[in-house]
């Protein structure tokens, strides 16, 4: 046991960015680096296929980045209220402040900003994060917040999400976030698989993998949306009530799931309706010999293909 619990007493405590965490920043930077690397080699691609590959790669990177990034975003549910409320325990002092609650898959983020910021001879600008990851103890974090003497609005909202609270918010959001996170990781795995399969002679399976990606992304959204059907405990700060709404992470994930379903459905439909057009679109290469002949090409990527094509002898050359 070290003095001051291993914390330097004369320096400010580390602050958390409201709604923007370090893992989220790392994910964004990694995918931006991949996109920048592709843009560097883009001028080396000739012809109209350059724009096709630009759209294809950037769209695929966006889907993958979104699926990973929302795990670390705190903006699945967002609530904001301006109120006049008590400031500290055992004190009659009141402050006018803006309180914001962000709920993510791994915890909550509470911000308290005075309006104006300087009141009661101090700066009222708090941002506290409470997590419920597998290795984190939410109750212990709340106990530490009590020892630090955080403002009443922060402690009030944090207490509503404790496991022992009669509101039951902890169990609802924790369980929903756990299932949403699991389904999103499955969606990410199928996204990786779809990129591989769409680059093979079997684009049909790539389309099916995209459909599965969209389905699991929507499963994660529905897991979080199921909380709305349960009456939640009211959150009152002073004379105002704080209500949460779907945040940016929720809507972006919903849009990504619908986009994956649309793209996957388009690939599967083209495979059965216009397989040659799909192959030309995905490969962006010269037509093969059977297409030059004007005959029906042999589609190796279609498992339901029943035709048998004879080899084109004009395309066979021998070196004597």
Swiss-Prot record:
**InterPro entries from the xrefs?**
Dual_oxidase_maturation_fac
A GO biological process of this protein is: protein localization
Instruction: Give me the Extracellular side stretches, as residue ranges.
Output: 1-21, 78-183, 228-247
- Please list the GO terms describing molecular function: enzyme binding
Protein location: Endoplasmic reticulum membrane
Q: Which UniProt keywords apply?
A: Congenital hypothyroidism, Disulfide bond, Endoplasmic reticulum, Glycoprotein, Membrane, Protein transport, Transmembrane, Transmembrane helix, Transport
**Which top-rank group of organisms is this from?**
Eukaryota
Q: Could you state one GO cellular component term attached to this entry?
A: cell leading edge
**Transmembrane feature ranges:** 22-42, 57-77, 184-204, 207-227, 248-268
Instruction: Write out the topological domains of type Cytoplasmic.
Output: 43-56, 205-206, 269-320
Q: Per the record, a Pfam family?
A: DuoxA
Q: Give the range the annotation lists for the signal sequence.
A: none
Where expressed (tissues)? Specifically expressed in thyroid. Also detected in salivary glands.
- Would you identify the family this protein belongs to, as annotated? Belongs to the DUOXA family.
Which disease is reported for it? Answer: Thyroid dyshormonogenesis 5: A disorder due to thyroid dyshormonogenesis, causing hypothyroidism, goiter, and variable mental deficits derived from unrecognized and untreated hypothyroidism.
Which proteins does it associate with, and in what oligomeric form? Heterodimer with DUXA2; disulfide-linked. Interacts with CSNK1G2.
Quote the protein name from its UniProt record. Answer: Dual oxidase maturation factor 2
The species is Homo sapiens (Human)
Task: Point out the gene that encodes the protein.
Answer: DUOXA2
